[in-house]
Design a protein with these regions (language model features):
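Cleavable N-terminal signal peptides
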Residues: 13-14, 25
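C-terminal region of N-terminal signal peptides and the immediate post-cleavage residues
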Residues: 3-7, 19-36
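A low-complexity, Ser/Thr/Gly/Pro-enriched, surface-exposed linker/loop concept
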Residues: 28-49, 74-120, 155-177
Length: 177
């Protein structure tokens, strides 16, 4: 009986020590911060941002970055020099469901958009369940309200994340073929 108490005390001490050293998910440097609330931004008229013969809504992000919302497929993304993107990716894109992904592609993925204009600060462009907004610093955030997932393209960092309760690890681009 005494031996069982000693074993239980030892196991409890080990578990207690492990829990005491646990770090909350929000403090983990490998966990992306949440996507900003783009829905609090003022909406713009999507017709003013129609590109690619009406197939997309497009706008300019940070210098050299083109962002689109595809009205045919429900996809959304930004292409160009993505500051701080994992693996040097030059494309981040998502679809109607699921977490957006980073990739390295040849050329400018959304070249068919042609000339695009920037969104004014603190506005958003929405198509169905996806909204993309720009803040005062020129940071682009796109959020799919259906899955609560999206991405951020900012002046120093770009990442994909989930706003659901579980933490989202930073997304690495797929390996080059």
């Amino acid at each position: 009986m005494r031996r069982n108490l000693l074993v239980a005390a030892a196991v409890g001490a080990v578990i207690g020590a492990a829990l005491a050293g646990a770090v909350p998910a929000s403090a983990d440097p490998d966990v992306a911060p949440p996507i900003p609330d783009v829905f609090s931004n003022m909406p713009v008229n999507p017709a003013d941002y129609t590109v690619n013969a009406g197939k997309w809504f497009g706008f300019a992000g940070p210098p050299g970055v083109v962002c689109i919302l595809d009205t045919l497929k429900g996809e959304y993304g930004c292409a160009g020099p993505l500051p701080g993107a994992p693996g040097g990716a030059n494309l981040v894109s998502g679809g109607p469901v699921g977490l957006p992904e980073f990739a390295v592609v040849d050329g400018l993925k959304y070249a068919d958009a042609g000339p695009v204009r920037p969104l004014p600060p603190n506005t958003r462009l929405t198509y169905r369940q996806v909204s993309c907004g720009v803040d005062d610093a020129g940071v682009v955030a796109c959020l799919n309200s259906r899955d609560q997932v999206g991405f951020v393209v900012g002046p120093t960092a770009s990442y994909a994340a989930s706003n659901r309760l579980e933490a989202t690890a930073l997304v690495e681009p797929p390996p080059a073929p």
